Amino acid sequence: MIASEIFERGVQDPFCQDCDYEDETDVQSFLGSNDLNDFVNSKLASFSFENSSKSNNSHHSSSTNAGNTSRHIGNHTIGHHLRKIKTAPHHLYGFVPANSTNNSNEPIRPSPRRIRANSSTLIHQLSRQSTRQSSLGDAADSCFDHKCIKPRSRHSSCYGIPTHLYGLEKYVSSELDSLAVANDQSNDLTSPLTSVSTPASNSNSYLNLNSSSAAYPSSYLSNEKNNRLKLISHGKISSNNVPGHSGNLNHYHRERTPSNLRRESFSLLSNGSSSSPLQTRNNSYSNSLVKSPSNSSLNTSVASSNEESSPHTSNCLEERNPRRKSFIKLSLASSFSN
């Protein structure tokens, strides 16, 4: 049981020196303190008798040689026999009997039972000290060079990950470059189309048509004709300009310019349109209410909003100067014509 406990302590903490003194009380309680002391005293007495006989035989030799040999033999014999007693503590050298003689000047101390463990602790401490000094030196150099880099230690294995990633990047970089070039080329090819497809007029216009008629198929042109006819039926576009410009998309694009809008407004005024633009728009919405009963809710809301806004606009026109009335009429006519 005692041996198993000693073995467990040694396995759990092989560098602990306090384990040498922990089992003293257990051994004394197991064997008895008197028996242990008598046994140790008898052993030490026999060792001292052997040392005294050997010192008498070597008395004719020189004093220095005699001291060295006796010191060597005494330490060796005592250490050898005491190491057999596994549970004897280190401080038993104080129980040496008084009749024993020792020619050496140094006190007799038995060798410790855990020499390998103690040496391994010393080696471990020295290795850690060297590692700590090297890490501190690396940190000082990095701080001096203004490079905040964590010093590498032999216990860390995370420094292999960036190297591994960089190694993979060698094989992936060519494919990434090719994909990037392909994406750039595709963007360059699609950019003219997007620039052509963007409308060059106001976002509030009813038709966003392109100046180049070749970019649209015949089905798109037919749809545009149908949309144009629907706008004419609702009164949003005058039917006078339909036969001359029904299939010309460039004319639709030119209609949205300010100069063309002014020309159309002058042409409308010269043709004798006595009714105001607000009245024509209200009439067109009333016609749309009659023609499309399915959209009654939407049309009624629009008509009501127009009826509410018409007195306010008429009052504004009356309050302003008469010279500006013609300009306001022209601007309203140009906006409603589109």
Swiss-Prot record:
The modification Phosphoserine is found at residue 119. Residues 50-70, 267-306 have a biased composition (Low complexity). Residues 50-72, 267-322 are annotated as: Disordered. It comes from the Eukaryota. The keyword Electron transport does not apply. Residues 307-316 have a biased composition (Polar residues). Pfam families: MBR1. Keywords: Phosphoprotein. InterPro entries: Mbr1 (IPR031443). The keyword Ribonucleoprotein does not apply. Belongs to the ISF1/MBR1 family. Could influence the NAM7/UPF1 function, possibly at the level of mRNA turnover. Participates in mitochondrial biogenesis. This is Increasing suppression factor 1. It comes from Saccharomyces cerevisiae (strain JAY291) (Baker's yeast).
